[in-house]
């Protein structure tokens, strides 16, 4: 079996054990394919993830920040952006084909992929049809590292624009801890009241942390 960097090559490891056992750096190394003089591709992958703080930090970095790294040019930047876009489209297409209530795990993974590593609080709304399939999702409000101000009327206006019958609310906690605050619960109540005037249901509010997601519906708070 081929070895890289003193260990089993990521591609060989993937073929033998499956992609799920690979680390973030190993998966990235498969996409990058080659390193640079003096730095093996595995070392390069590990360095990039460490430099940007996380895999999400890496794939969401802009062109200037990424290309400032030695060995990263247009080609590797394009590869990294393609990874991010493919992942997003995969989740989106899956969500749009079935009711989100039938597969809550996919919904939570989708939201974690988008929100879990953001440095500011982001309030996202998923707009659903009458069969609870996703019409579209939108990051509606951006806050600070510890709070986000929302406007229920804007959410209702957007829901009417796309003819949504129901919503799923979501926001992240940059601290990494997903436990909802009293402010989160009050915010949810305000949105529910505004939506109920037009018979739009709020099915859930998900608070996203790092590696965890808390559902208001599962806690019986709606």
UniProtKB/Swiss-Prot annotation:
The keyword Hydrolase applies. Keywords: Hydrolase, Metal-binding, Metalloprotease, Protease, Zinc. It comes from the Bacteria. GO terms for molecular function: metal ion binding; metallopeptidase activity. Residues 100-222 form the MPN domain. Zn(2+) binds at residues 171, 173, 184. A motif (JAMM motif) lies at residues 171-184. The keyword Protein biosynthesis does not apply. GO terms for biological process: proteolysis. Belongs to the UPF0758 family. YicR subfamily. This is UPF0758 protein YE0063.
